[in-house]
Amino acid sequence: MESSSMTTHQEEPLDLSTGNHGNSELSDEQQIMQVMESCGMFLQQNLFAWFLQSMLEASASQPQLTQDEPPENDTKENDLVKQNKSEVNDENESTPSPTQNSRRRTSTGKIDRRMVGKMCTRRYEANARERNRVQQLSKMFDQLRVCLPIEDDAKISKLATLKVASSYIGYLGAILQENSNDEEEFKKQLQVELECAKTLRK
C-alpha cells in the first residue's frame, strides 16, 4: 500500500508540471506576438520619420540647384551673341581690306610668280598621273592579248582587242554550257572580229 501511495504522489507532480508547461508555451507565443507588434510599430514610426526627413532635404536642396544653374534664356542669348560675333569675324576675314588690295597691286610680282609655280607643279603632277595610267592600261591590254587566239606579233587596237575578247569569252562560255547553237554563233562572231582586227592592222 505504501508503495502505491508513493507512486500516486510521484505521478501528481508530473501532471502539474505538464499543465504549467502548456501555460508557459502560450505565454511565450503571446510575448513573441507582442514583440513583433512593437517592432512593427517602431519600424512604421521610423520609416515615416525617415520619409519626412528625406522630403525636407529634397525640398531644401532643390532651390540651391536652380540658383547654381544659369537660366536657359541667358545661355541661348549668349550662344546667339557668340554666333553673331563669329559670323562678323568670318565676314571681315573673307572681305579683303583696301590696304590688302593696294599691297597686291603695288607688289613686285612675287605673288604672281608663286601662283604660276603652283600651277606648273600641279600640271606636272597631273601629267605624271596620266602617263602612269596609260602605261598601266597598256600593260593590261598586253596581258589580255596573250590570252586571246591571235598571233604573237599582231598589233591591234585596244577597241579591236576588247571586241575579240568579248567574242572569245562568249565562245568559251558556250563550250562550258555545252550549248551547240551558242557555240556556233560565238565562233562565227569571233572569226569576224579577228578578220576585222587584221584588216585594221593592215
Swiss-Prot record:
Q: What is its main location?
A: nucleus
Transcription regulation as a keyword of this entry, yes or no, is: yes
DNA-binding: is it a keyword of this entry?
Answer: yes
Please indicate which superkingdom the organism of origin belongs to. Eukaryota
Report keywords, A-Z.
Cytoplasm, DNA-binding, Nucleus, Transcription, Transcription regulation
Q: Which cysteines are joined by disulfide bonds?
A: none
- Name this protein carries in UniProt: Helix-loop-helix protein 10
Please give the organism: Caenorhabditis elegans
